[in-house]
């Protein structure tokens, strides 16, 4: 899972992720927005879940983060729709709406993001 952190001309941090993990970048850009307290909450949840059968979820405005002791799922909230809403022959492109990754990989991105934000 490759990632890149950038600052736009206003100084706001933007995250770009590799193909297949774009939604993780969108989660940082839309939900975190340099809110380190949210990252604290996610890291605390990961520590609590490690070695357990439980799961944790944080629904945001645009994206929901779900995790258990082994993996993290980020999905767009708009992804919930009935299958019969699609026209016949059409497929829903969800590469940028759903992503799964390991907890350790995700926490590495969280730590790198935190370090980048604090370098102002």
UniProtKB/Swiss-Prot annotation:
InterPro entries: UPF0231. It comes from the Bacteria. Pfam families: UPF0231. Belongs to the UPF0231 family. HAMAP family: UPF0231. This is UPF0231 protein YacL. It comes from Escherichia coli O6:H1 (strain CFT073 / ATCC 700928 / UPEC). The gene is yacL.
